[in-house]
């Protein structure tokens, strides 16, 4: 097994718990979007990441490793969801970088402005707490974005390389 395939396999296994986490979030977003239909676009985008993760994992296990014939439908599912997931992972990456390179003063200003607009916000939640949560979430999304972008790039290359498996 080449180094590229070893990395791809590791990234695939890393994406599975991330996809399960996002599937759980997607169910919550779906429940809240029933009262706000414009949020359904976010449900669709997050669902694409989950679908991409599991269809690409199926392609890895049955197509690449066992060289079993795959349907054209599987190829279409991988490619369509890969492009939407690439968009989402790029957003994760760009937003995380912008938050992580911002100074604490700038972010604290935005957080304080946000807290002033929230009328019944609990006093126990301070701007420092929100800042640390924001930075932690940004690191998680940065890692997710990098893993996703590298994985999607490799998947699209493998789909092209193993094109003969799709009938």
Model-identified regions with their sequence ranges:
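Cytosolic juxtamembrane helix at the C-terminal end of the final transmembrane segment
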Residues: 2-5, 56-74, 99-107, 142-167
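Hydrophobic alpha-helical transmembrane segments
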Residues: 119-148
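Membrane-interfacial helical/loop segments at transmembrane boundaries in membrane proteins
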Residues: 104-126
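Membrane-helix interface motif
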Residues: 23-31, 60, 97-112
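Hydrophobic alpha-helical membrane-insertion segments
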Residues: 80-104
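Transmembrane alpha-helical insertion/packing segments
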Residues: 1-58
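Juxtamembrane loop-transmembrane helix junctions in multi-pass integral membrane proteins
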Residues: 3-6, 32-36, 66-79, 122-132
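Physicochemical signature of membrane-embedded alpha-helices that form the seven-helix bundle of GPCRs
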Residues: 8-14, 21, 40-47, 77-87, ...
């Amino acid at each position: 097994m080449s180094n590229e395939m070893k990395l791809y396999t590791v990234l695939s296994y890393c994406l599975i718990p991330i996809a399960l986490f996002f599937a759980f979030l997607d169910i919550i977003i779906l429940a809240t979007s029933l009262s706000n239909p414009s949020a359904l676009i976010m449900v669709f985008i997050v669902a694409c990441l989950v679908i991409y993760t599991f269809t690409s994992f199926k392609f890895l296990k049955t197509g690449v490793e066992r060289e079993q014939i795959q349907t054209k439908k599987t190829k279409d599912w991988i490619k369509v969801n890969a492009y939407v997931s690439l968009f989402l992972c790029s957003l994760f990456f760009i937003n995380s970088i912008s938050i992580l390179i911002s100074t604490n003063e700038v972010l604290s200003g935005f957080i304080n402005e946000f807290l002033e607009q929230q009328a019944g916000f609990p006093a126990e939640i301070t701007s420092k707490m929100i800042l640390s949560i924001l930075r932690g979430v940004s690191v998680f999304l940065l890692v997710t974005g990098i893993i996703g972008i590298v994985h999607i790039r490799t998947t699209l290359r493998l789909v092209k390389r193993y094109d003969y498996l799709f009938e």
